[in-house]
C-alpha cells in the first residue's frame, strides 16, 4: 500500500518510499538498437520480489535515443508501449515509477555523440522530448517523477546544466502541472560535492513548486561505485556513507527543498560495508530522504553491487539491510 504523505520541516516528506533501480533499458552501445538484443525493459515479473520486500519505488533508466529515434521526431510507439505496460504493472502493485533519462546530457545519432545545448543538439529538442513524455504519462497516478537526466557531467563552457533543466521544467509544465520533476546534480550527481557543483540548482523555477533534487552516493574512495579495492583501501568506516551524503542532506534542509538518492550501493564479501550501509539508510530515513539501490533487473548477473533476484532463492546480504528501510519518517 502507498503511505499517506505528511509534510516535514526542511521540505522533506514522511512516508516516501525507498526502492531500487531496475536497469536494462539503458543497456548496450547500439542506438536505438534492437529490443531484447541490445537492451530490454523490466516487466511485471521483475516487480514481484521488490513488492514482497516492501520496497515500492522503482527508478526506470531509459535512453532518449530509444524512445525518440530522432530529435524533434515522434516518440517510438513500440518502446513507449513497453514502458507504459511496465508503469501500469507497477501501479497495479501499488508501486511508483521514477523515470530516468540515462543519457548524461548527450545522445548518439548515427554513431555520433552530441551534447545538449550545442548547435548539433538544441536545448529545445531536449525540452520537446520531455513535453511529449509528460503528455503521454500525465494521466498515470503512480509516476513518482520525471527524472530529467542521469549524472550530468563534463559539459563545455558554453553549455549549462541549469539552463537545460529549466528548459525541460518549462516544457513539462505546459502539459503537466502536477507530477514532480526530479533534477539530478551536476558532476555525476555527486552528493559529496553537491554544494560545490550543484548549489545553483536551488534557483530553478517551477510554477508548480514540485521539484525533487537527486544525488548519487557511493562509498568507495573515488565515489565511482566500482569498489575495486579493500574496505581499508577504499577508506571505509561505519559512518562513511553518512559523512558523504551529509552535504546534500544539509543543503536540502537549509534551502527547504525535497531530495532523493537516486543511486547507492555496496559490494558483498566484507560485512563492514553492511554496517556502513545501515548507518547511511538510517540517516536518510530520519531526514526524510528516500533512496534507490543500484541495481537490479532482468539482465544483471553478479556484478559488484547488483542484486539479481533469480539465484535459487539465495538473497544477497544487502537485502537484510535494505528491507529495514521501506519509507521515510
Regions found by a protein language model. Give the residues of each.
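N-terminal carbohydrate-binding accessory modules
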Residues: 5-59, 321-324
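Well-ordered alpha-helical segments within folded domains of soluble proteins
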Residues: 59-62, 98, 260-261
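Surface-exposed, active-site-proximal loop segments in enzymatic domains
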Residues: 28-35, 64-81, 105-121, 226-231, ...
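Solvent-exposed loop/turn segments at secondary-structure junctions
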Residues: 23-28, 57, 63-68, 103-106, ...
Amino acid at each position: 500500500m502507498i503511505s499517506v504523505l505528511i509534510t516535514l520541516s526542511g521540505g522533506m516528506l514522511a512516508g516516501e518510499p525507498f526502492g531500487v533501480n531496475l536497469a536494462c533499458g539503458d543497456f548496450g552501445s547500439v542506438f536505438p538498437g534492437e529490443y531484447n538484443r541490445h537492451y530490454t525493459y523490466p516487466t511485471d515479473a521483475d516487480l514481484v520480489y521488490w513488492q514482497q520486500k516492501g520496497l515500492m519505488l522503482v527508478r526506470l533508466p531509459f535512453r532518449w535515443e530509444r524512445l525518440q529515434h530522432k530529435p524533434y521526431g515522434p516518440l517510438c510507439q513500440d518502446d513507449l508501449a513497453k514502458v507504459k505496460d511496465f508503469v501500469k504493472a507497477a501501479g497495479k502493485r501499488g508501486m511508483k515509477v521514477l523515470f530516468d533519462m540515462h543519457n548524461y546530457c548527450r545522445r548518439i545519432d548515427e554513431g555520433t555523440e552530441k551534447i545538449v545545448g550545442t548547435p548539433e543538439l538544441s536545448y529545445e529538442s531536449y525540452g520537446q522530448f520531455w513535453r511529449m513524455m509528460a503528455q503521454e504519462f500525465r494521466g498515470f497516478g503512480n509516476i513518482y517523477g520525471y527524472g530529467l537526466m542521469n549524472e550530468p557531467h563534463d559539459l563545455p563552457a558554453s553549455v549549462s546544466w541549469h539552463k537545460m533543466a529549466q528548459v525541460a521544467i518549462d516544457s513539462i509544465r505546459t502539459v503537466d502541472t502536477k507530477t514532480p520533476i526530479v533534477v539530478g546534480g551536476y558532476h555525476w550527481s555527486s552528493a559529496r560535492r553537491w554544494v560545490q557543483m550543484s548549489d545553483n540548482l536551488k534557483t530553478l523555477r517551477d510554477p508548480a513548486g514540485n521539484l525533487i533534487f537527486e544525488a548519487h552516493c557511493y562509498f568507495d574512495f573515488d565515489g565511482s561505485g566500482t569498489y575495486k579495492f579493500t574496505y581499508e583501501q577504499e577508506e571505509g568506516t561505519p559512518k562513511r556513507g553518512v559523512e558523504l551524503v551529509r552535504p546534500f542532506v544539509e543543503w536540502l534542509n537549509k534551502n527547504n527543498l525535497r531530495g532523493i538518492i537516486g543511486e547507492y550501493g555496496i559490494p558483498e564479501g566484507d560485512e563492514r560495508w553492511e554496517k556502513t550501509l545501515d548507518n547511511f539508510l538510517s540517516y536518510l530515513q530520519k531526514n526524510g530522504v528516500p533512496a534507490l539501490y543500484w541495481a537490479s533487473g532482468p539482465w544483471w548477473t553478479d556484478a559488484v553491487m547488483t542484486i539479481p533476484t533469480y539465484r535459487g532463492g539465495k538473497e544477497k546480504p544487502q537485502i537484510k539491510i535494505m528491507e529495514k528501510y521501506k519509507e521515510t519518517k
